Amino acid sequence: MRWPLIVLAVLVIVLQYPLWLGKGGWLRVWDVDRQLQAQRETNQRLEQRNAGLEAEVRDLKSGNEAVEERARFELGLTKPDEIFVHTPRKP
């Protein structure tokens, strides 16, 4: 009576091993799901960044306002009749 119970227990353990620890087991599925979620978050951040860059490129191609704004803020350029006043920010 004891041998069939032991054989049955061993059989259950042998059948459960691939389910939990095998190549397509639950632990592997959980790990891949976690990696997939992290990749989706990265993709979302990059899509937002790309949209911002695309808008900036479109703005630079379409008119002179964006070019003028960049020249003013990044290079400190002014028009001939303007006076440039710089107010430093407190750290």
Swiss-Prot record:
Residues 1-3 are cytoplasmic. Keywords: Cell cycle, Cell division, Cell inner membrane, Cell membrane, Coiled coil, Membrane, Transmembrane, Transmembrane helix. Residues 22-91 are periplasmic. It is a single-pass type II membrane protein. GO terms for cellular component: cell division site; cell septum; plasma membrane. It is found in: Cell inner membrane. The chain crosses the membrane at residues 4-21. GO terms for biological process: FtsZ-dependent cytokinesis. Part of a complex composed of FtsB, FtsL and FtsQ. Essential cell division protein. May link together the upstream cell division proteins, which are predominantly cytoplasmic, with the downstream cell division proteins, which are predominantly periplasmic. Belongs to the FtsB family. This is Cell division protein FtsB. It comes from Aromatoleum aromaticum (strain DSM 19018 / LMG 30748 / EbN1). The lineage of its organism: Bacteria, Pseudomonadati, Pseudomonadota, Betaproteobacteria, Rhodocyclales. The gene is ftsB.
